[in-house]
Amino acid sequence: MLSNPAPRTRALIDNIQLFQEYHMKYPSHGYRWLNAKIRLDRGIVMSDPYAHKCCKKAGIKSKAKHYKYKKPGAPFKIFPNLLMSEMQIDRPLQCIVSDMTAFWVKGIYYELTLYMDLWNNEILSHSLSSKRGDRMTYISGLEGLLEKKKQHPEYQMILHSDQGSVYASKAFNDLLPMYVTRSMSRAGTPTDNSAMESINGWIKAELFMDFHVTGERPVQEEVDEYIRFFNEERPAYSLSYLTPKQYREKYAA
């Protein structure tokens, strides 16, 4: 390495070290996301090609693996897929997507149910259980969602899910007020809820690779902390690398 490098070379070296620092903290992400996170945290603006150059020189690659979880469902009531209608989502609480994802920590099985606003990818409600097949994660998460919905009583809302047995059950759907319209993915077609499927994969990668969930602390606390990070500090490609909170504050009426 040069003992007295030119300013541009010195800047490149410094930025390579900066990307290495962020990669150590967030190993599940690639250069575009790391660049956006650096911009968000440090106010340092770099082009994506330049960020790619820094990461390539540092040997940085995303270590994330995509997880897939397919659960059987015995549907009781099937609703049409309203997401297939190519509707325009242009406000908060217009369309909420929900799904359950599962993972293991220190030999204990956990199920996490999420309710996400498709407008800005904000997780509005979540519920965690270490009991396999616990229907209350769905119910508790739904109750949290409906509490937030009370802040905007004027809005109609679509709730989209797969055809899992809880989502299709009479007990679940009887909890829904009149202003909530149900929508469901077609059977065996996870791409109908691709946004939620993608988020589930990233969440599990980030929980273990970036947040290092080990069970040394209560898993509920670690999940709550991650959800806050997801909503407030994690830039999203689909939001032009704003966080869900930033997007809501910038565009919500």
Predicted segments, located by residue:
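RNase H-like two-metal-ion nuclease catalytic core shared by retroviral integrases
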Residues: 72-74, 161-163, 169-170, 184-204, ...
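Short small-residue beta-strand/loop micro-motif enriched in glycine and branched aliphatics
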Residues: 122-126, 182-185, 208-210
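Active-site beta-loop-alpha junctions of metal-dependent nucleic acid enzymes
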Residues: 127-152
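C-terminal domain-tail junction helix/linker
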Residues: 173, 177, 202-253
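Cysteine/selenocysteine-centered motifs that mediate thiol-based redox chemistry or coordinate metal-sulfur cofactors
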Residues: 150-168
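Basic, flexible linker segments flanking DNA-binding modules
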Residues: 1-91, 189, 243-251
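An active-site-proximal beta-strand-loop segment
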Residues: 85, 89-124, 128-132
